[in-house]
Amino acid sequence: MRPRGNTQEDYLLRIIRQAAELLRQLRRRLLGGEASAESIRQDAAVAIDFLLGSQGPVLGMLDAISAARLVGHPAIVELWCALLDVEAEAAEASGDPTFALRCRARALALRNAARMLWGETNPLAEGEPSSE
């Protein structure tokens, strides 16, 4: 009989894989020009909601350190940042540089917070699904 894995860890890995795939699709669409920047921006926001789950609204209001600590997993924080980067690129392309700047600033703050909490490691390069 196969030993059962940690259910919470399995769930996190599944969410990480699915969000990484959404990120790949969004990047492809953004680079390919096959969809409007506004639809990519909206889909990036939906992907962030999926990744963060019911805590998303609260996490969006917290400072970066508190948000990263509450997320609790460096790969999820990095995916969140990567999705914010896509959202920023799409906002820039759709003529909203102010929103793009806010997204980029939040991604930078979250990355810095993750470094403070977990060090310099790249969680997506160490056995987690790649977002590229």
Feature names for model-found ranges:
Residues 18-19, 25-26, 80-83, 87-90, ...:
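Structural register within alpha-helical repeat arrays
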Residues 41-45, 97, 101-119:
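TPR/TPR-like (Sel1-like) alpha-helical repeat modules
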Residues 4, 11, 30, 85, ...:
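Hydrophobic/aromatic side-chain positions at a characteristic register within alpha-helices
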Residues 71-76, 91-101:
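Short acidic, glycine/proline-enriched loop segments that cap or flank alpha-helices
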Residues 24-34, 88-91, 95, 114-115, ...:
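Short coil/turn linking the two alpha-helices of tandem helical-hairpin repeats
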Residues 61-65, 117-129:
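Long amphipathic alpha-helical segments
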Residues 1-77, 112:
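N-terminal alpha-helical interaction modules that lie
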Residues 14, 21, 76-79, 83, ...:
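The tetratricopeptide repeat
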